């Protein structure tokens, strides 16, 4: 790259700081990396220029020589060096390059071995409750099938009396290092060991119960305590009742999803209960004592005289128990006044007398369409 301005290649002004040089290189190296621009010769050449410029400007002696004489004058007059030492000096650049190469660069973050402790998977179970069960609480038994550690081998996967052996290919690390030659030099990457599958151990004599897996499917009956006050959409967590962990890892959790069947009479909103009650016109007018159903049983309630249809009365503390404490909600009673559709002679006569006593009968005779057109 004779007669080219290294600062210009990296998009910098002469005299740029080490930090500015490093940041510029990171940005351009990712943009023009060959694995990100396969088949693009122009990008490949640009990447070579970027690396050559960085090798000069990142080295204090070469940079000083270049700034003074316009040439780095280092052995070979160019080249790209050996990158087998990894990208440790570039912070997280090695992690970014991992996505290009599909493996870990030496000096970068290491992969987790498959024989490391792993938390078990969480599970979900939906349970249906009656209105009463949700309101008062209940204990239910459910049947689930989950993955558990094999009792025969203790979860090792090896036949009883034996144990897994360290993989002779990866030395128990679960990964192997592979050197790749690129236009930039040699890159060392890590990949999962193909002999042990990344576990770091090999089972020569597998357990006859789990066939080397270390875990088996088991059916279990679990008792679930449903607290009073739950409603549709609530979820109850059962810690540690999910699938067992692997390699000594903790078990997952079991989440119980609640669905409540609607009641024929009561309607629930939050922790309050709503109910409609029907009374006759005379009772609404004169007032009456009546029996109102609640979740605790029937209670006596006095409907005051002159109650209009649609009036709502509150029965304090007759609602649902709050799950996390704080007392109970209320029950609201909506009064619906029924108008009779069929009257016998006695009822009709009584209503006429009521109308006359109310001063409505005479007014009614003089009203209507005939009077309107007179």
Swiss-Prot record:
Cofactor, free-text remark: Binds 2 Zn(2+) ions per monomer.
Intervals holding CXXCXGXG motif repeats: 150-157, 167-174, 193-200, 207-214
The keyword Repeat is assigned to this record: yes
Localization terms from the record: Cytoplasm
Protein's GO biological process: chaperone cofactor-dependent protein refolding; DNA replication; protein refolding; response to heat
Taxonomic superkingdom: Bacteria
UniProt keyword list: Chaperone, Cytoplasm, DNA replication, Metal-binding, Repeat, Stress response, Zinc, Zinc-finger
Induction section of the entry: By heat shock.
Binding site for Zn(2+) 2: 167, 170, 193, 196
GO CC, alphabetical: cytoplasm
Zinc finger (CR-type): 137-219
Sequence ranges assigned to domain J in this UniProt record: 5-70
Purpose of the protein: Participates actively in the response to hyperosmotic and heat shock by preventing the aggregation of stress-denatured proteins and by disaggregating proteins, also in an autonomous, DnaK-independent fashion. Unfolded proteins bind initially to DnaJ; upon interaction with the DnaJ-bound protein, DnaK hydrolyzes its bound ATP, resulting in the formation of a stable complex. GrpE releases ADP from DnaK; ATP binding to DnaK triggers the release of the substrate protein, thus completing the reaction cycle.
Family to which this protein belongs: Belongs to the DnaJ family.
Subunit structure: Homodimer.
This protein's name: Chaperone protein DnaJ
């Amino acid at each position: 790259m004779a007669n080219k301005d290294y600062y210009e290649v990296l998009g910098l002004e002469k005299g740029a700081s080490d930090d500015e040089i490093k940041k510029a290189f990171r940005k351009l190296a990712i943009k023009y990396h060959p694995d990100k621009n396969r088949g693009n010769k122009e990008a490949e050449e640009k990447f070579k220029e970027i690396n050559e410029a960085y090798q000069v400007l990142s080295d204090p002696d070469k940079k000083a020589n270049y700034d003074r004489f316009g040439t780095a004058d280092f052995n070979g007059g160019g080249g790209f060096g050996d990158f087998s030492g990894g990208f440790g000096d570039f912070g997280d650049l090695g992690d970014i390059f991992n996505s290009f190469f599909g493996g870990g660069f030496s000096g970068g973050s290491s992969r987790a071995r498959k024989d490391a402790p792993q938390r078990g998977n969480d599970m979900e179970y939906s349970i249906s409750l009656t209105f009463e069960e949700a309101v008062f609480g209940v204990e239910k038994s459910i049947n689930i099938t989950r993955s558990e550690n094999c009792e025969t081998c203790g979860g090792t996967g090896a036949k009883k009396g034996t144990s897994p052996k360290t993989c002779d290919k990866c030395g128990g690390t679960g990964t192997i290092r592979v050197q790749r030659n690129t236009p930039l030099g040699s890159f060392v990457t890590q990949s999962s060991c193909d002999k042990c599958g990344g576990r770091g151990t090999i089972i020569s004599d597998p357990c006859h119960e789990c066939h080397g897996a270390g875990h088996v499917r088991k059916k279990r009956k679990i008792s679930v305590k449903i607290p009073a006050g739950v409603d549709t959409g609530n979820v109850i967590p059962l810690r540690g009742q999910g699938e067992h962990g692997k390699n000594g890892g903790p078990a997952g959790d079991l989440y119980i999803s609640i669905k409540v069947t609607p009641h024929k009479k009561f309607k629930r909103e939050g922790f309050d209960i709503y109910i409609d009650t029907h009374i006759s016109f005379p009772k609404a007018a004169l007032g009456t004592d009546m029996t109102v159903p609640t979740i605790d049983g029937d209670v006596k309630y006095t409907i005051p005289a002159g109650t209009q249809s649609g009036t709502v009365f509150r029965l304090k503390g007759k609602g649902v128990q709050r799950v996390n404490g704080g007392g109970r909600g209320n029950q609201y009673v909506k009064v619906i006044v029924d108008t009779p559709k069929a009257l016998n002679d006695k009822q009709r006569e009584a209503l006429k007398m009521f109308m006359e006593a109310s001063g409505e009968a005479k007014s009614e005779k003089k009203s209507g369409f005939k009077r309107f057109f007179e």
